[in-house]
Amino acid sequence: MQYQGRSKRSKTGARLRPRSKKSKSELGREPTETTVGEPRFRTVDVRGDAEKVRVLSTNVVNVATDSGAERATIEDVSANDANPNYARRNIITKGAIIETDAGTARVTSRPGQDGQVNATRVDE
C-alpha cells in the first residue's frame, strides 16, 4: 500500500502539522505490471462495493481495424513509452507498441484497470 496523502513537510522543508490522521481513502496500491504469458486475472475490491479486474498476464488482444475488431495473439512488446525497461521485460501498458499475429498494434486500454487488452492497428 502506498500513502498518497499530504506530505509532512512543505516544499521548503518546514514541518506541517497534521489536519487529521491518515485515512484508508488516502492509500493507493502498487501498479499491476501486465506481462505477456498465460492469461491470469485478479479481482480487487474498490470503493462503492465494486470490483476491478486486473490482468496479471495475457497473450490475447482485441485489435480494432477499419472493418471491425478481431482477436489476436500477442507475440512481443516492441516499444513502451512509459518506461524503456517495460519493453525489455514484456510489460504491457496503455500506449505500448505490441507485435501480434494480426500485425503491429498500439494498446488503447489500461490492462491493470480494465481487465482486458484492446489495441488499434498501426500502419508502418
Swiss-Prot record:
Span-the-membrane segments of this chain are: none
- Keyword Endoplasmic reticulum in the entry? The reply is no
Q: Kindly give the PROSITE patterns that the UniProt entry links to this protein.
A: RIBOSOMAL_S8E
In what ranges is there compositional bias, type Polar residues? Answer: 106-124
Region annotation (Disordered) maps to 1-40, 102-124
Could you list this entry's UniProt keywords, alphabetically sorted.
Ribonucleoprotein, Ribosomal protein
PANTHER family per the UniProt record, alphabetical: 40S RIBOSOMAL PROTEIN S8
Q: How does it assemble?
A: Part of the 30S ribosomal subunit.
Task: Tell me the NCBIfam families matching this sequence.
Answer: eS8 (TIGR00307)
Q: What is the protein named?
A: Small ribosomal subunit protein eS8
